[in-house]
């Protein structure tokens, strides 16, 4: 969503043809759809899926067990009205610039004040312009709280951005390896002989002209054994490759946070400058790396939720088993 939003915003700049804006995606509507789906998943589907999965076949469904999902679903709704009444308003202070005074009134006032005081330049500026500080109260809608509470997920992203690459690399390191004990060698020899006999039988049937459905089914079974082993090897090799790439992305993200986010003022734009230079060279050259970095950060947050688990009041979201 973020790369698509950035591309669509750039296509509506003033120096571009106005008709290009009509060809862009409706990003505002798409963002609302994503937020609504995320809200339904986080607050309804994920918390209460355990209540449905814990019900095993063969168990007696007593009244206490039936009331448990009702209580779990009714308690959050009973807490929402008082929380909404107490937390639905936000107080914030804004600065309202005053109007510039007319030269005639300003000169008349300055002549009268110079007779009594020796004015400095600061006092003159205070008299020229008067700034007002206003305290306003605004109504916070529900999406505001959803966006504000998303700051909690930074913990998962911070934990997993460091451990996700290492987990992938260690998964390759601790992959199943060849163990040539006597029992394993005997079992492997037996399965190899069986597979060899089946393969030779299929070859004889194919040479004899039999190409029915049964032959194709048996050939598919034999090929599936070889394919599954090849995919297993490629799966662990892919973990190693993505682990190394993820380690590089994590280091770059951490450096960007240190030099741009934690330092005030920022010491160096770093990733921002890189994306700007790539975007000036070509549209896809700037959008593709930006999408990769965003997607990696989102995957780190999701993986961190699965790795740590989180308790929201009495509801378990992504519990770690």
Swiss-Prot record:
Membrane in keyword set: yes
InterPro entries the UniProt entry points to: LMBR1-like_membr_prot (IPR006876)
Topology within the bilayer: Multi-pass membrane protein
A single GO cellular-component term on record: membrane
Disulphide bridges: none
Subcellular location: Membrane
Signal peptide: none
Sequence intervals crossing the membrane: 28-48, 116-133, 139-159, 240-260, 284-304
Keyword line: Membrane, Transmembrane, Transmembrane helix
Cross-referenced Pfam families: LMBR1
Family: Belongs to the LIMR family.
Protein name: LIMR family protein SELMODRAFT_432210
Biological source species: Selaginella moellendorffii (Spikemoss)
Lineage of producing organism: Eukaryota, Viridiplantae, Streptophyta, Embryophyta, Tracheophyta
């Amino acid at each position: 969503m973020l790369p698509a939003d950035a591309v669509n915003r750039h296509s509506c700049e003033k120096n571009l043809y106005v008709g290009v804006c009509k060809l862009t995606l409706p990003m505002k509507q798409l963002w609302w759809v994503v937020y609504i789906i995320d809200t339904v998943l986080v607050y309804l589907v994920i918390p209460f899926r355990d209540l449905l999965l814990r019900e095993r076949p063969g168990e007696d469904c007593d009244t206490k067990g039936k009331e448990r999902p009702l209580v779990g679903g009714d308690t959050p709704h009973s807490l929402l009205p008082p929380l909404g009444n107490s937390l639905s308003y936000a107080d914030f202070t804004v600065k309202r610039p005053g109007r510039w005074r007319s030269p005639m009134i300003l000169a008349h006032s300055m002549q009268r004040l110079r007779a009594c005081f020796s004015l400095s330049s600061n006092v003159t500026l205070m008299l020229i312009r008067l700034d007002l500080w206003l305290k306003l109260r605004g109504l916070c809608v529900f999406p505001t709280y959803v966006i504000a509470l998303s700051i909690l997920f930074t913990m998962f992203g911070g934990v997993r951005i460091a451990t996700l690459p290492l987990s992938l690399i260690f998964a390759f390191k601790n992959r199943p390896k060849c163990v040539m004990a006597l029992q394993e060698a005997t079992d492997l020899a037996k399965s190899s002989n069986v597979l060899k006999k089946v393969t030779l039988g299929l070859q004889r049937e194919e040479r004899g002209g039999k190409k029915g459905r049964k032959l194709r089914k048996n050939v598919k079974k034999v090929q599936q054994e070889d394919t599954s082993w090849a995919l297993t090897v490629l799966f662990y090799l892919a973990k190693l490759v993505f682990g190394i790439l993820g380690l590089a992305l994590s280091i770059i993200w951490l450096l960007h946070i240190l030099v741009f986010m934690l330092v005030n003022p920022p010491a160096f734009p770093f990733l921002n400058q890189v994306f700007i230079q790539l975007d000036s060279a070509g549209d896809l050259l700037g959008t593709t790396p930006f999408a990769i970095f965003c997607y990696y950060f989102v995957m780190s947050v999701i993986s961190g939720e699965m790795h740590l688990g989180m308790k929201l009041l009495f509801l378990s979201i992504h519990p770690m088993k």
